[in-house]
């Protein structure tokens, strides 16, 4: 073996490997909006909101519930329910195989998690969509878990909050999935009759059968900044009407301007503002919100090759 190979090339390769392995995977994240390279521990402190441009990144259902509810006294509702391939549906892949893959990827049985707990000491029930599970699509189990959460709210006479993030009805369940639109709408009508508040929080994105049912039936409809909300996607609409859509069409700011939603609240403010709003709706004293102390984080230099 030549001296050049031993003295120059091999040490160079070894240094390169050491350099690569010295940066743990997942420690850095690039903002999809401004492309700033963000330190993961720092990003967690801001609840996955970019500190540079305020872009609200998508987060999972459990993470969303964790940052919203009080830490103590939580209980999951309908956790035992699992989807069934009743129609033996197959497109390019068997539905049961898609379910298995989604369950393995997310660790969840289906695309909605419902949980009872407290918000600033006030009893509430929360549902949150897991968009990573087949695009947060609504099938029989999603509908049933939502209904169980609403029935819990009826039984305990406590407010209900739902965080929507969905592509719509689950096509693999055909009419069974479409039936969930009526099923969830019916139970929300019961909440309204009983005077129990339901707050719908729209997160990026909300489309199809979910936007055409439960997501737009809140007594108060809230959205995160720049969330995409609609029935069909902008591209489909442009191809149908053969016109260029306005800038920002289907963004939450556009919907607020045109009266389709009530307010836009940033993720960091959801707990105190919704807690205050629900207390007013329930005739309760304004809850005290104490922000958790933020410890300073030493941010190391970002890798150049991210």
From Swiss-Prot:
One Pfam annotation reads Zn_ribbon_ACC
Cofactor binding notes: Binds 1 zinc ion per subunit.
List the PROSITE patterns: COA_CT_NTER
Residue ranges annotated as zinc fingers (C4-type) are 31-53
EC main class here is transferase
Question: Per the record, what is one GO cellular component?
Answer: acetate CoA-transferase complex
**Residue ranges constituting the CoA carboxyltransferase N-terminal domain according to the UniProt record:** 27-296
**According to its UniProt record, in which pathway does this protein act?**
Lipid metabolism; malonyl-CoA biosynthesis; malonyl-CoA from acetyl-CoA: step 1/1
Which Gene3D superfamilies does its entry note? 2-enoyl-CoA Hydratase, Chain A, domain 1
Q: Give the domain of life.
A: Bacteria
Database matches in InterPro entries: AcCoA_carboxyl_beta, Acetyl_CoA_COase_Trfase_b_su, ClpP/crotonase-like_dom_sf, COA_CT_N, Znf-ACC
Please verify whether the record's keywords include Flavoprotein: no
Q: Give GO MF terms, alphabetically.
A: acetyl-CoA carboxylase activity; ATP binding; carboxyl- or carbamoyltransferase activity; zinc ion binding
Q: Identify which cofactors the protein needs according to its UniProt entry.
A: Zn(2+)
Subcellular location(s): the record lists:
Cytoplasm
Which keywords fit this entry according to its UniProt record?
ATP-binding, Cytoplasm, Fatty acid biosynthesis, Fatty acid metabolism, Lipid biosynthesis, Lipid metabolism, Metal-binding, Nucleotide-binding, Transferase, Zinc, Zinc-finger
EC no.? 2.1.3.15
Question: Record's HAMAP family?
Answer: AcetylCoA_CT_beta
Enumerate the PANTHER family for this protein.
ACETYL-COENZYME A CARBOXYLASE CARBOXYL TRANSFERASE SUBUNIT BETA, CHLOROPLASTIC
The UniProt similarity line reads: Belongs to the AccD/PCCB family.
Subunit structure, as described in the record: Acetyl-CoA carboxylase is a heterohexamer composed of biotin carboxyl carrier protein (AccB), biotin carboxylase (AccC) and two subunits each of ACCase subunit alpha (AccA) and ACCase subunit beta (AccD).
Per its database record, what is this protein's job?
Answer: Component of the acetyl coenzyme A carboxylase (ACC) complex. Biotin carboxylase (BC) catalyzes the carboxylation of biotin on its carrier protein (BCCP) and then the CO(2) group is transferred by the transcarboxylase to acetyl-CoA to form malonyl-CoA.
NCBIfam families annotated for this entry? accD (TIGR00515)
Name under which the protein is recorded: Acetyl-coenzyme A carboxylase carboxyl transferase subunit beta
